[in-house]
Amino acid sequence: MEPISINIEDKKCFFYQDENANKCIIQPVDEHELGMLDAEIKEIKRLTNDNSFLLVAVLIDDWNKELSPWKAPAVFGKEGFGCGAADTLCFIRDFLIPYIRSSYRNVSEYYLGGYSLAGLFSLWAGYQTDIFRGIAAVSPSVWFEGWDQYILANTIMAKKTYLSLGDKESKTKNKIMSTVGERIRMQYECLRNDHILEWNVGNHFAQPDIRTAKGFSWL
């Protein structure tokens, strides 16, 4: 499927559209993930037997800054995490969704999701606003410093939440990232909406497109 590329508020967005779309999936991606979206969309259609959705990929230029809810030290390499998630959510809520509403009048439901840090961002956004009916947090970076305290003190607003993790993701020498298994179970226990935790085979880098498709399909 050939996407339509549109710049909205200087943010590049890719629209994978169906003329009869009545629901919209919004997914923050990097350049590498753009190349996997065709396979992801194909898998969503296969799993759901449903073509009536619009997928909008939002290209993220600075992954560690634009998707992080607050500042945190680096866990690998030297690059730490910024606090740009609020700006990214503001763009989606105040500019992207109004554009979609005006251009695709049949769309009435919005879903947000992503992989890795984009999965954490999607979870965090679900705590900030009720505009998203469902959240797909696929192999989310729930090891993020302070996330455990945050979910204990807050309640998610989305009606449905999909969580998944690879069964080998916690098997790492990195002490912070090795907590991801414990943290994803904690996240699951803290949710009070319709939710599921699915375990995938493999490490963090195994089939992100297929895993993400499974998440959106469950929603």
Predicted segments with their positions:
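Serine-hydrolase catalytic machinery in alpha/beta-hydrolase-like enzymes
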Residues: 12, 19-103
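Gly/Ala-rich beta-loop-alpha elbow adjacent to hydrolase catalytic centers
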Residues: 113-118, 122
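The feature captures the conserved acid-bearing segment of alpha/beta-hydrolase catalytic domains
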Residues: 142-219
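A conserved short beta-strand
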Residues: 131-145
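Active-site signature of alpha/beta-hydrolase-fold catalytic machinery across serine-
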Residues: 124-128
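N-terminal cap/lid segment of alpha/beta-hydrolase-fold proteins
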Residues: 1-18
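The conserved beta1-alpha1 loop
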Residues: 26-30, 139, 165
